[in-house]
Design a protein with these regions (language model features):
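C-terminal segment of N-terminal export signals and the immediately downstream linker at the start
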Residues: 23-57, 61, 65
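Gly/Pro-rich active-site loop or hairpin
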Residues: 52-55, 63, 93, 202, ...
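Glycine-rich, proline-tolerant flexible connector loops at the mouths of alpha/beta enzymes
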Residues: 76-101
């Protein structure tokens, strides 16, 4: 991977930042992850939230279609503690598949389960609840380890009004990371846009502290930065959702460059089908990710609409775009 990364460092930058016009999307260089891909093609990951129950209701055939489209790595969604498996997370029905059965189906289709999104249902992050968080993550880590998953990622933001709230949350994150490390799993946090609002120091809150738009302009520190500053790099990594960073008025490339050892995974996301809007500078984003040696990335396609397209079509079209892109 190192030689490919050195090659990428000499590649030309298409445009500065993460926003781009459609004409810029054709440029880029081959990736180091592509060099490590299976013989069938590039490493292309999918966050299964993109399909929800549409995938689970006919898993074998759905996996075949995704593999044919080019996907060969998964980040799961919908961990179900009671059922010891994975479902649709309450979306579109109650279909749950046992973890071992899910892994076998993916193995049969040639898809590796690399990561998983999950969050505890405990709402209050305070020291009195630490044991409850520990119990959740211990049970989840054991199940995930049993099917060879290497990354567990929390994608939900607790309530944070000041820097002290953030520090308590970070203590929970550090404890979760230590629990996961003990079974050979890396624990991480996934952003949306609210991590890029600012919170004041404890005791300096104002009425504007409860207004997300005002907090984006306010003094104080970004929640994402507080998480980076107050978590142990040996226990907690970060997965950057590049689309939600842009929606939070941030340049994802800048966050990657400024924190090269903390961001290990990416979510590649657009308004709907990847590459369709022309607003995301994917060549720059991939280059920034490869330059810091990311471990992987996953397409996420949320529900949208385009005449004649199903959600499954959108997911497959996204893979088609990335399979042909020279910068991946």
């Amino acid at each position: 991977m190192t030689s490919r990364r050195q090659f990428l460092k000499t590649a030309s930058v298409v445009t500065a930042g993460a926003l781009v016009t459609p004409s810029a999307l054709a440029s880029g260089k081959a990736s180091p992850l592509a060099a490590a891909a299976p013989a069938s093609g590039k490493r292309i990951g999918l966050q299964t939230y993109s399909l929800g129950v549409e995938l689970l209701k006919d898993l074998p055939n759905g996996l075949k279609r995704l593999a044919a489209a080019g996907y060969n790595e998964f980040e799961l969604f919908g961990y179900n503690e009671q059922a010891a498996g994975f479902g649709a997370g309450g979306r579109d029905g109650a279909v749950t598949i046992k973890a071992a059965d899910y892994k076998k189906a993916c193995d049969d289709a040639g898809i590796k389960i690399l990561s998983s999104h999950l969050s505890p249902s405990i709402r209050e992050y305070k020291s009195e609840n630490f044991a409850q968080f520990d119990e959740f993550w211990k049970k989840a880590a054991d199940l995930h380890a049993s099917i060879g998953i290497k990354y567990m990622v929390q994608p939900s933001l607790p309530s944070i009004k000041n820097d002290e709230d953030a520090k308590v949350v970070c203590e929970v994150f550090n404890r979760a990371g230590e629990i996961c490390n003990n079974v050979g799993i890396k624990w991480g946090y996934h952003n949306h846009s609210n991590e890029f609002v600012r919170v004041p120091k404890a005791g300096e809150e104002t009425p504007a502290s409860n207004d997300p738009m005002a907090r984006m302009r306010a003094r104080g520190e970004y929640i994402e930065q507080l998480f980076l500053d107050n978590t142990d790099p040996d226990k907690v990594f970060f997965e950057l959702d590049v689309y939600w960073a842009v929606m939070g008025q941030q340049d994802p490339c800048e966050w990657l460059r400024n924190n090269p050892k903390r961001f290990r995974l990416l979510h590649i996301k657009d308004r709907w089908i990847i590459g369709d809007s022309g607003m995301m500078n994917f060549p720059n984003i991939f280059k920034a990710g490869y330059d810091i040696g990311i471990d992987g990335w996953f397409v996420e396609v949320e529900n949208g609409s385009k005449k004649g397209y199903t959600q499954f079509d959108a997911v497959c079209e996204s893979a088609k775009y990335l399979s042909k892109a020279s910068f991946v």
